[in-house]
Amino acid sequence: MKRTFQPSELKRKRIHGFRARMATKAGRQVLARRRAKGRHSLTV
């Protein structure tokens, strides 16, 4: 049985990246929340 986590940098960027977040209203809300909280890193 193979392990479930098979990392792919491309998929990671496309789903969780900055431009993906900026593309939707909800994603922009995520960024706003993380800025308000003072996160050092907003996206992956």
UniProtKB/Swiss-Prot annotation:
Superkingdom, natural source: Bacteria
Entry GO terms, CC: ribonucleoprotein complex; ribosome
Keywords carried by this UniProt record: Ribonucleoprotein, Ribosomal protein
The keyword Iron is assigned to this record: no
GO MF annotation, one: structural constituent of ribosome
A single GO BP: translation
Tagged with keyword Amino-acid biosynthesis: no
Compositional bias of kind Basic residues: 31-44
PROSITE patterns: RIBOSOMAL_L34 (PS00784)
InterPro entries associated with the record: Ribosomal_bL34, Ribosomal_bL34_CS
Span of the signal peptide: none
Region of interest (Disordered), ranges: 24-44
Recorded family membership: Belongs to the bacterial ribosomal protein bL34 family.
UniProt name for this protein: Large ribosomal subunit protein bL34
Name of the encoding gene: rpmH
